[in-house]
């Protein structure tokens, strides 16, 4: 990735920052740092890994313990929420889920919280590093450790990875959350989503992703879309489940 680098806020983080830079193939930036420059910077501190970008204000990081995800965990949202219904959670049944577009891992965390084993695939090395850091920190916290134990992260191209699966390793459900179509007014696009677009790029392979997902899901493929959005690749689902802003399109495969 051009115009990006790895930084650290103390010498104690130097070795870890150097290893991360080597793994991601990014330059190691040495202090003093000017975080106002036009670059994407991963900053490693003793607390967490953060992503800084001058146009997007506050840094981006993954947190399953506090913040919005901590609130959802404490609220104990049940199986009647739209995501759970879309996945097919009923009774004591917890389907094996493959989240092929993991992103920051929020939906995968909710599904793991509800008892589903979840395999997460993230193609972007930078997003994957942020997610890996968030999982590692949550793994050390007693309240979230059992949930994180249900989650397995892989950094890979989802189409290629699913193509290598043997039939016995097929998931019950493949979950897809491709980038929503970009709105014409940039002010309406959340800064976080704008940054993810920069990192992940356009979902030009989304139609192929759906095609491969339909071939390997034992029970269903679930596609998350904006409520008024078009069907992914123009393929009509068997049915949909809606919330105020989101629509889950369900494609049955059995």
Swiss-Prot record:
Its main location: cytoplasm. One of its GO terms (molecular function) is rRNA (guanine-N2-)-methyltransferase activity. Its EC number is 2.1.1.242. It is an enzyme of class 2 (transferase). It is found in: Cytoplasm. Keywords: Cytoplasm, Methyltransferase, rRNA processing, S-adenosyl-L-methionine, Transferase. Specifically methylates the guanosine in position 1516 of 16S rRNA. S-adenosyl-L-methionine binds at residues 106-107, 177. This is Ribosomal RNA small subunit methyltransferase J. It catalyses: guanosine(1516) in 16S rRNA + S-adenosyl-L-methionine = N(2)-methylguanosine(1516) in 16S rRNA + S-adenosyl-L-homocysteine + H(+). GO terms for cellular component: cytoplasm. Gene3D superfamilies: Vaccinia Virus protein VP39. Pfam families: SAM_MT. Belongs to the methyltransferase superfamily. RsmJ family.
């Amino acid at each position: 990735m051009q115009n990006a680098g790895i930084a650290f806020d103390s010498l104690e983080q130097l070795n870890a920052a150097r290893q991360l830079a080597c793994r991601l193939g990014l330059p190691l930036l040495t202090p003093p740092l000017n975080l106002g420059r036009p670059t994407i910077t991963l900053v490693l501190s003793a607390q967490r890994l953060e992503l800084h970008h001058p146009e997007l204000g506050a840094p981006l990081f993954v947190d399953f313990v506090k913040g919005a995800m901590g609130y959802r965990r404490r609220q104990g949202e049940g199986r009647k929420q739209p995501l759970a219904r879309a996945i097919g959670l009923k009774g004591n049944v917890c389907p094996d889920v493959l989240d092929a577009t993991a992103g920051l891992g929020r939906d995968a965390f909710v599904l793991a919280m509800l008892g589903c084993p979840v395999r997460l695939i993230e193609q972007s090395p930078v997003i994957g590093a942020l997610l890996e850091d968030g999982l590692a920190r949550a793994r050390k916290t007693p309240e979230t450790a059992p949930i994180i134990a249900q989650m397995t992260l892989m950094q890979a191209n989802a189409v290629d990875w699913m193509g290598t699966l043997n039939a016995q390793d097929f998931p019950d459900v493949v979950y897809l959350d491709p980038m929503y179509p970009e709105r014409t007014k940039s002010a309406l696009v959340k800064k976080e989503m704008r940054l993810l677009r920069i990192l992940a790029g356009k979902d030009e392979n989304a139609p192929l992703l759906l095609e491969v997902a339909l071939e390997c899901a034992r029970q269903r493929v679930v596609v998350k879309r904006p409520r008024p959005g078009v069907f992914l690749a123009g393929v009509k689902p068997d049915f949909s489940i809606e919330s105020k802003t989101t629509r889950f399109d369900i494609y049955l495969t059995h």
